[in-house]
Amino acid sequence: MRKTITDIQQMKVRGEPIAMLTAYDAVTAALFDAAGVPMLLVGDSLGDNVLGFGSTIPVTIDDMVRHTAAVARGAQSALIVADMPFLTYATLEMAVVAARRLMQEGGAQAVKLEGGQAMTPIVRRLVECGVPVMGHLGYTPQSAHVFGKVRVQGRSVAAARRLIEDALALESAGAFALVLELVPAPLAAAITERLRIPTIGIGAGPHCDGQVQVSTDMLGLRDDFKPRHARRFADLAPIIRNAAAAYIAAVGERSFPADEHSSRMDETVLREALEGLS
């Protein structure tokens, strides 16, 4: 049976850490689901981890719906949260339309959006419409052009206070959980203590209620990128390269396909089929 919002929130009540991973396709989602991951995020990180873009900005709602649907087909138990991509929730009307597509067409059980107090009318409206909303504070990738570069957020008194106020405002608006990205660990701990809803950290220290990692980072699929806050639990890039090289070599030396990979045919049938043909 699929996990629910209540299941995730009860994990905070019990003090049980929440593990969340990004997923973008049915096969990977099924593997993560079988491992017992309680919550999967179909992130707009799809853009720079799957689609070859340099950021999340080019990702469209059509992209998100398509990949969310794939993940929903692959994972039968995990709660599926889908990112609302750049500028799809600039107004109340746009937000409702985007959320409807992600849930009706994509099969998500919840959506995630970035931003603080300015987003509370959007969060409140979506919740009123029956859409569970996860917030996202700290470094918000959709604002990459505003930030200029990836950096830790909330290090000054004013910035830290603003993050705390934003977190409380999102909870008050009805968010069921909150991602804290690139936030100093002590500040993330203070926010976590003040909220009734779960906090999910990424580069926010060990004291959040849960953690989320981009799956390509966690699996070691990229040699060119290793964020400081990420830990590689596998190193799949060389394994995949070596497998591809072995396949190329096997084809080149005609050791693949072998007899066991091929289908047989009655020689008489083939001979009769070829009769009269040039």
Swiss-Prot record:
Mg(2+) binds at residues 44, 83, 114. It is found in: Cytoplasm. It catalyses: 3-methyl-2-oxobutanoate + (6R)-5,10-methylene-5,6,7,8-tetrahydrofolate + H2O = 2-dehydropantoate + (6S)-5,6,7,8-tetrahydrofolate. Its cofactor is Mg(2+). Binds 1 Mg(2+) ion per subunit. Its main location: cytoplasm. It comes from the Bacteria. One of its GO terms (molecular function) is 3-methyl-2-oxobutanoate hydroxymethyltransferase activity. SUPFAM superfamilies: Phosphoenolpyruvate/pyruvate domain. The active site is at 181 (proton acceptor). Pathway: Cofactor biosynthesis; (R)-pantothenate biosynthesis; (R)-pantoate from 3-methyl-2-oxobutanoate: step 1/2. 3-methyl-2-oxobutanoate binds at residues 44-45, 83, 112. It is an enzyme of class 2 (transferase). Its EC number is 2.1.2.11. One of its GO terms (biological process) is pantothenate biosynthetic process. Keywords: Cytoplasm, Magnesium, Metal-binding, Pantothenate biosynthesis, Transferase. It holds the Pfam family Pantoate_transf. InterPro entries: Pantoate_hydroxy_MeTrfase, Pyrv/PenolPyrv_kinase-like_dom, Pyrv_kinase-like_dom_sf. Catalyzes the reversible reaction in which hydroxymethyl group from 5,10-methylenetetrahydrofolate is transferred onto alpha-ketoisovalerate to form ketopantoate. Belongs to the PanB family. Homodecamer; pentamer of dimers. PANTHER family: 3-METHYL-2-OXOBUTANOATE HYDROXYMETHYLTRANSFERASE (PTHR20881:SF0). This is 3-methyl-2-oxobutanoate hydroxymethyltransferase. It comes from Roseiflexus castenholzii (strain DSM 13941 / HLO8). The gene is panB.
